[in-house]
């Protein structure tokens, strides 16, 4: 994973954790948790691609990795929709910038996971 993506994740997570969105703070905490989970999943796929010989152990260790992959894409789509919704309803420029960057990062991560998964198939 390149260092720009790592710092982007860290920056967005830090800024999202500082936001106070009133009654929706539970939703925001859920988004933060999913962002962190997504980052870990993307990292593990990237590591598996780096050790392409690891493909067989990945498949035997987890016969349902394609199902997990599908689930992660569903989570990404949900996060994208949630971030777009937040972007539409917020008037705070700090939040708008944060959510725009989060959206961009989600789209990049989705593409990276697709690339990794095609290399593993």
Curated annotation (Swiss-Prot):
Q: Which GO terms describe its biological process?
A: exit of virus from host cell nucleus through nuclear pore
Q: What is its subcellular localisation?
A: Virion; Host nucleus
UniProt cross-references to Pfam families, sorted A to Z? Flu_NS2
Note the InterPro entries from the entry.
Answer: Flu_NS2
Superkingdom, natural source: Viruses
Q: Which Gene3D superfamilies match?
A: 1.10.287.230, S15/NS1, RNA-binding (1.10.287.10)
Motif residue range(s): Nuclear export signal: 12-21, 85-94
Keyword annotations for this protein? Answer: Host nucleus, Host-virus interaction, Transport, Virion
- SUPFAM superfamilies listed in its UniProt record: Nonstructural protein ns2, Nep, M1-binding domain
A single GO CC term for this protein reads:
virion component
Quick check: keyword Ion transport in the entry?
no
Q: What is its main location?
A: virion
The remark listed among the other comments is:
Average number present in a viral particle is estimated to be 130-200 molecules.
Purpose: Mediates the nuclear export of encapsidated genomic RNAs (ribonucleoproteins, RNPs). Acts as an adapter between viral RNPs complexes and the nuclear export machinery of the cell. Possesses no intrinsic RNA-binding activity, but includes a C-terminal M1-binding domain. This domain is believed to allow recognition of RNPs bound to the protein M1.
Q: Which family does it belong to?
A: Belongs to the influenza viruses NEP family.
- What is said about its interaction partners and assembly? Interacts with protein M1. May interact with host nucleoporin RAB/HRB and exportin XPO1/CRM1.
User: Could you identify this protein by its name?
Assistant: Nuclear export protein
* Species lineage: Viruses, Riboviria, Orthornavirae, Negarnaviricota, Polyploviricotina
Q: Which gene encodes it?
A: NS
């Amino acid at each position: 994973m390149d260092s720009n993506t790592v710092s982007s994740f860290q920056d967005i997570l830090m800024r999202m954790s500082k936001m106070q969105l009133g009654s929706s703070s539970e939703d925001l905490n859920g988004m933060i948790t999913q962002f962190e989970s997504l980052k870990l999943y993307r990292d593990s796929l990237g590591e598996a691609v780096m050790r392409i010989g690891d493909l067989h152990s990945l498949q035997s260790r987890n016969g349902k990795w394609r199902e997990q992959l599908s689930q992660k894409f569903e989570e990404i789509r949900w996060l994208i929709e949630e971030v777009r919704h937040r972007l539409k309803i917020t008037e705070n420029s700090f939040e708008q910038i944060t959510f725009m960057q989060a959206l961009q990062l989600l789209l990049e991560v989705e593409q990276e996971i697709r690339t990794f998964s095609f290399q593993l198939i």
